[in-house]
Amino acid sequence: MEFELEFTPDAWVHLQEFSARDRGLILDAINTQLRYEPDVETRNRKPMKDNLLATWELRVGKFRVFYDIDNDTVKIVYILAIGYKDHNQLFIGGKRFEL
């Protein structure tokens, strides 16, 4: 069954911080990786442990997409945040997070 994708306002702001090329890569990955079986762990998708931001992470090269899933009555993937990783640091919305 196909999942609906829903971006939070913050996620849209995060996405706009990237170049048009990078936005295209990220959006293509979201559409191909999260429309079907977004809750199946793969090489690029994994459940997050002890993370307050989201329950799942999608890796797109250096970019990270953090999302939650509603599997109950309606199938929705909520895109919560989008950032990029540089070595052991994660940047989301211009803020740095240590990993």
Residue ranges of each PLM-predicted region?
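Active-site micro-motifs of SAM-dependent methyltransferase domains
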Residues: 13, 32, 36, 84-87
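Short histidine-centered beta-strand/loop micro-motifs
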Residues: 15-17, 46, 57-59, 68-70
